[in-house]
């Protein structure tokens, strides 16, 4: 179809792109009952792994977007991350064998297609309109809506692109989640900041056929990711991908033509020469050229159009935060769009999306860029100096996970609780006969949680009505039932003890908006949120 949009072509949100960012946004927004239209250039989900790992915060986002058990059915905790020299000597060893505050392992080794299938199923079940095989051509924002024009796209038997109908849809808001070559970003002529380090992997994904032998002192079956530096050769790495899959990477020229290497013969020669593996050990099913670099869009919003995920930022893979950052974009923008679309918040809160997310992403781009440049040193003397420093314990600090210092949070003055702006916990709770992770028991959204008291008793009618309008769960958590949810694994007791607070008000992206030192301060926290939302 073409021409003026009909009633069936008008939506609350149009999402360009249906990778992890678009999938998460489509699921979260449709869960809230909004009319969502997805336009994706490829005819189906990609179906192959790209992300190798996510952190516990991202796992909680996926939990909000779909059935987490289905999403992680082939995943395992990632135990360690090692940087080694070409002799196999450890330079950097990051232990990851503990739990994340969000209720999942600190890092998860995953099979990405499972996650995408689960989010796709949720989005469709919740009524999102998913249009695969439609490539966005242009985006035209106006004061009251944005129009998106797309064209039907398919690949013929001759492997050439075939174009079909043109369609124009109209939405109150548009999310450009269409990747590094974003048509939305290009349509709006948004530029990008460039980081200095660039390189590439030749990636070979495989299924393990049997227990693998130790490789340079590391067991590939132990959920340990290892990068081997090679100043006189080519760096390489082995990365577990959940229960059955594994990725082998080999350094490549990011500007070179590697078509002669993306095949079975080259891949197995590489595995035999470097790792001593053969077809008896693994079955390779994917051959890919993966260039990487750091880039950041100069703006993430023009009027009613937003960028998210790889359309807004790229980073090298060495901190495993590219996909995590994309999922954070999706949930941050989704909960704010939800409130604006439902009329429970002022549109001005959308300005906080870029203000909150951009500095957060920059930390990870900087950190992964620095780690990659260090791992790929090609000067032999510089590599020897690096090795000596690392083996002597003179290791540059890995960036700590950033937290919010401004945006939609209570004042972070000296008197304010330190928990503000940090991630809130998710523990196991029991309500009646139901026991599970907090979000599974109570649902996704705002959370007002009191320690050993029900926060509802401290609120007046207006405050309670406001929390109901924004879909906030209000619950007390304690050691015994007595009208409260039971803190089954002690997570909340430990959290409240460590932070010295009696209540926390948590945003839908699991960031602590505000906290109260004592129950009597709880109403002030609620009023502050109401003021900031303009509700």
Label the model's feature ranges.
Residues 22-23:
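N-terminal Rossmann-fold NAD(P) dinucleotide-binding loop
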Residues 74, 260-322, 360, 364-367:
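FAD/FMN-dependent oxidoreductases across multiple families
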Residues 9-11, 161-173:
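Core beta-strand elements of the Rossmann-like FAD/NAD(P) dinucleotide-binding domain
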Residues 1-12, 16, 31-32, 85-88, ...:
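Helical substrate-recognition/capping region of FAD-dependent monooxygenase/halogenase enzymes
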Residues 30-50:
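Glycine-rich FAD pyrophosphate-binding loop
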Residues 156-160, 173-292:
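Conserved FAD-binding catalytic core of PHBH/FMO-like flavoproteins
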């Amino acid at each position: 179809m073409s021409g003026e949009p009909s009633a069936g072509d008008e939506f609350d949100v149009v999402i360009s792109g249906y990778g992890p960012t678009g999938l998460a946004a489509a699921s979260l927004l449709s869960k809230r009952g909004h009319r969502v239209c997805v336009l994706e250039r490829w005819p189906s989900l990609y179906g192959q792994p790209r992300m190798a790992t996510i952190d516990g915060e991202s796992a909680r986002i996926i939990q909000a977007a779909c059935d987490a058990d289905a999403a992680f059915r082939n995943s395992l905790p990632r135990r360690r991350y090692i940087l080694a020299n070409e002799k196999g000597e450890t330079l950097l060893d990051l232990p990851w064998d503990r739990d994340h505050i969000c209720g999942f392992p600190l890092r998860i080794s995953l099979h990405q297609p499972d996650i995408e299938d689960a989010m796709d199923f949720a989005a469709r079940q919740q009524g999102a309109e998913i249009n695969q095989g439609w490539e966005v051509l242009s985006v035209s924002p106006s004061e009251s809506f944005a129009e998106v024009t797309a064209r039907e796209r398919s690949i013929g038997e001759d492997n050439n692109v075939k174009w079909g109908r043109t369609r124009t849809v109209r939405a109150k808001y548009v999310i450009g989640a269409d990747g590094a070559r974003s048509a939305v970003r290009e349509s709006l002529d948004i530029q990008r900041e460039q980081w200095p380090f660039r390189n590439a992997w030749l990636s070979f994904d495989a299924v393990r056929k049997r227990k693998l032998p130790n490789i340079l002192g590391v067991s590939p079956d132990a959920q340990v990711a290892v990068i081997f530096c090679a100043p006189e050769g080519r760096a390489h790495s082995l990365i577990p991908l959940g229960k059955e899959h594994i990725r082998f990477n080999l350094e490549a020229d990011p500007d070179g033509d590697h078509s002669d290497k993306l095949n079975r013969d080259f891949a197995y020669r590489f595995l035999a020469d470097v790792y001593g593996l053969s077809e008896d050990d693994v079955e390779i099913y994917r051959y890919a050229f993966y260039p990487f670099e750091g880039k950041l869009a100069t703006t993430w919003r023009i009027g009613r159009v937003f960028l998210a995920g790889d359309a807004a930022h790229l980073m090298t893979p060495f901190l495993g935060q590219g996909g995590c950052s994309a999922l954070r974009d999706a949930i941050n923008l989704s909960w704010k769009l939800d409130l604006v679309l439902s009329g429970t918040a002022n549109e001005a809160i959308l300005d906080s999306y870029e203000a909150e997310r951009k500095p957060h992403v920059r930390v990870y781009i900087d950190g992964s860029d620095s780690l990659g440049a260090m791992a790929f040193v090609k000067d032999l003397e510089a590599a020897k100096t690096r090795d000596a420093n690392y083996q002597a314990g003179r290791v540059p600090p890995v960036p700590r996970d950033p937290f919010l210092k401004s945006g939609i949070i209570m004042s972070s003055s000296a008197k304010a609780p330190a928990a503000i702006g940090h991630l809130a916990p998710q523990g196991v709770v029991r309500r009646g006969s139901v026991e599970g992770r907090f979000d599974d028991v109570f649902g996704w959204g705002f959370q007002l949680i009191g320690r050993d008291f029900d926060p509802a008793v401290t609120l007046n009618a207006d405050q309670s009505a406001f929390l109901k309008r924004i879909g906030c769960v209000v619950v007390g958590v304690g050691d015994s039932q007595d009208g409260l949810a039971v803190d089954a694994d002690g997570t909340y007791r430990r959290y409240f003890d460590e932070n010295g607070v009696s209540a926390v008000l948590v945003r839908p992206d699991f960031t602590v908006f505000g906290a109260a030192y004592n129950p009597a301060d709880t109403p002030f926290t609620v009023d502050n949120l109401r003021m900031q939302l303009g509700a």
